[in-house]
A protein has these predicted regions:
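Short Pro/Gly-enriched beta-strand edge/turn motifs at strand-loop
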Residues: 36-45, 50-51, 137-139
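Hydrophobic residues positioned within well-ordered beta-strands of beta-sheet architectures
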Residues: 68, 112-114, 128, 152-154, ...
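HotDog/MaoC-like acyl-thioester-processing domains
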Residues: 2-32, 122-123, 133-183
């Protein structure tokens, strides 16, 4: 696990120092951004092979923020809209990504519970954004450092390609501090 922890840590530093708004007109900044996101998606694919197989990708990650996408292609239900399981996929994995990159590899995120409220069918790819403010990240670290674990929740708004709000997710996570020993 030390190798993957080092890889997560290095990727987190690389991505957090890139400019999420970099365009091709700024080739070095754009290359840093896109290679960082490619590394994040590769780590996810190595850790959770189900994710890339089912069209999941991280589109943007920076301190306190993650945006992810799931493709409609290969994930259609019997009505031709996005399959319910794909909504869960795109709503669940970003919480782990956000936690790993904001807290660091010394903390392991675990999903405890998640609910989805479906508002309307999505007939395109679906995106979700999550954020954690600095104070919340710090509170999670302090509690996990003191007790070995901490709980937090994330709410996500899922949008289709046209910007329609198609679902809302609420996820309850627990973070465990690796190697914690109670005093």
């Amino acid at each position: 696990m030390a190798l993957i922890d080092n890889l997560i840590g290095a990727t987190g530093h690389w991505v957090s120092s890139s400019d999420p708004k970099a365009r091709i007109t700024q080739p070095l900044a754009w290359l840093r951004k896109t290679s960082g996101y490619a590394a994040v998606n590769r780590i996810i694919g190595l850790s959770i092979p189900f994710a890339p197989r089912n069209g999941f990708s991280v589109e943007e990650v920076r301190p306190g923020f993650v945006k992810a996408r799931v493709r409609l292609k290969g994930n259609k239900n019997h009505f031709g809209s996005l399959y319910a399981g794909a909504y869960f996929l795109v709503a669940e994995i970003p919480g782990g990504v956000l936690t790993l990159f904001d807290l660091g590899p010394a903390y392991t995120p675990i999903l405890k519970e998640m609910t989805l409220q479906f508002l309307q069918p999505a007939n395109s790819d679906v995106f979700v954004e999550f954020s954690l403010d600095e104070a919340t990240v710090e509170a999670i670290k302090v509690e996990a450092d003191q007790t070995g674990r901490a709980a937090f929740s994330l709410e996500g708004t899922l949008y289709d390609m046209e910007g329609n709000h198609v679902a809302t997710s609420i996820a309850q996570y627990r973070v465990r501090k690796k190697g914690f020993k109670a005093s």
